[in-house]
Amino acid sequence: QDDIKLDIYYFSLEESREKVILSEISKYLFSKYRKRVSIKQLLSRGRYNTIDPETIKQIHEARDYINQFLDVVKIIDNVRSPSAIFNYMQNVAYNIGTFFDSQGVELSRQEHERIKADLPGAKDKISYYRTTHPRHYVIVLTDHISLLYNEKSPTGSMMSQWETMSTFSNKYCISLRDKYGFIPVNVQQQTSAKEQVESNFRGASVTEKLEPSLDGL
């Protein structure tokens, strides 16, 4: 809808920005022309991976689609730790919205600059936050969270993978949701072992075992 503004901040921890864009081009070619063109083919890698002139023309046609995609989806592939992702999104919040005090009065520009600089006491007057656009939906998509760089604990030791993911979800994602109204979406992969068909004692396939479950994450 025209009165809704959507931004998706896609923290791609597994694929580079280039690969995500090439994947979208591949999807475009299949959706519109039913052509299966892999990322490897788009990169013209391999002895026989040459693209015919017709497909090259169709790839150029995808430019408008890709630009529209990138207008909404901001691909970030160089920010990888929980605190770094939080700081990145906090800076986004500073640029697209405003803080108010308990009386509903917008904080001054100078007060906002003090908040951005994280000066002592700068955040004491903050009561709530609003995006400048009244219906601005901001999705923070992290794919996938088991690839997060391990965070340092308050004692200075490195957290485990589980502790890092827990800190990201329970501390930073909740803060982004509650303070700024952002929408965190965390992707977690199913282990490959759970994708194998399992059978019951009679040898019959147990299809329910293929459904995602906590023990397979």
Map each language-model feature to its residues:
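Cytosolic-facing regulatory segments adjacent to core modules
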Residues: D2-T132
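Flexible beta-alpha connector loops of hexameric P-loop NTPases
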Residues: K74, K152-M165, Q196-R202
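Well-ordered, non-membrane alpha-helical segments in soluble/globular domains
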Residues: I56-I59, I85-N91, Q161-S175, G203
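Loop/turn-to-beta-strand initiation segments
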Residues: D7, L70-V73, R135-I139, K179-V185
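Phosphate-binding/switch region of NTP-binding enzymes
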Residues: K171-L217
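A short acidic (Asp/Glu
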Residues: K19-I25, N150-S153, E195-E198
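Residues immediately C-terminal
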Residues: L147
